[in-house]
UniProtKB/Swiss-Prot annotation:
Lineage summary: Bacteria, Pseudomonadati, Thermodesulfobacteriota, Desulfovibrionia, Desulfovibrionales
Name of protein: Phosphatidylserine decarboxylase proenzyme
Family in the record: Belongs to the phosphatidylserine decarboxylase family. PSD-A subfamily.
BP term (GO), one: phosphatidylethanolamine biosynthetic process
Complex formation: Heterodimer of a large membrane-associated beta subunit and a small pyruvoyl-containing alpha subunit.
Keyword field: Cell membrane, Decarboxylase, Lipid biosynthesis, Lipid metabolism, Lyase, Membrane, Phospholipid biosynthesis, Phospholipid metabolism, Pyruvate, Zymogen
Length: 215
């Protein structure tokens, strides 16, 4: 979903093409400083929109990280779809992280809610409610409810959703991207406990964020 054979998300191609073409034109004109700056822009966009393959864990009753980044919050919070309180794990993606988002579980998307808003620093607590965000309600094979929220940030100004209600996602499957620095929140069912701590670095589709409680 959005992945190309070049290992770059399709959202990056317009940016890469513009910078590369500009670099070529400036080089032809002999404007070397501008040519070099545009070449740097080309390399940066290629790096930012990279989409590497991931090794998805096959262990049962786990949830993997929906995003690359750093754990900045683990706390009870009302999810934006049901309004019920669940443990929420917040992942902040800086501008150097891979920004392709992946499903934490295998499940069906029952609802998608997009809300326009501000573009505050995504690491702020109030960004969850006030910033532009897109929420996904997933139902796993056990009937448990999960909510994933893409939150736009200070620099990120576009949330890209590549799924629709009724779609079934596999664990670790790509479902969207947020441009240029942002945040993703994962709300857990009460039967699951976080396996990460504040400050941990996580990898989308690979790092295990939560496990089901032993009965």
């Amino acid at each position: 979903m959005g992945k190309t054979n070049l290992g770059i998300d399709q959202e990056g191609f317009p940016y890469i093409a513009i910078f590369a073409f500009s670099s070529l034109i400036f080089a032809i004109l002999g404007w070397w400083l501008l040519a070099v700056l545009c070449l740097i822009g080309t390399i940066f966009c290629g790096h930012f929109f990279r989409d590497p393959e991931r090794i998805i864990p096959t262990e049962a009753n786990i949830a993997v990280s929906p995003a690359d980044g750093k754990i900045i919050r683990i706390e009870p919070r009302q999810d934006p779809i049901s309004g019920e309180s669940h443990t929420c794990i917040s992942i902040f993606m800086n501008i150097c992280n891979v920004h392709v988002n992946r499903s934490p579980i295998k499940g069906q998307i029952e609802a998608i809610q997009y809300v326009q808003g501000h573009f505050l620093n995504a690491s702020l607590d109030k960004a969850a409610k006030e910033n532009e965000h897109c929420s996904y309600l997933l139902r796993d094979q056990d009937g448990k409810q999960w909510v994933v929220v893409q939150i736009a940030g200070l620099i990120a100004r576009r949330i890209v959703c590549r799924t629709k209600e009724g779609d079934i996602l596999n664990r670790g499957e790509r479902f969207g991207i947020i441009r240029f620095g942002s945040r993703v929140d994962l709300y857990l069912p009460e039967e699951y406990t976080p396996t990460v701590n504040l400050g941990n670095k996580v990898i989308a589709g690979e790092t295990i964020l939560a496990k089901k409680n032993q009965e």
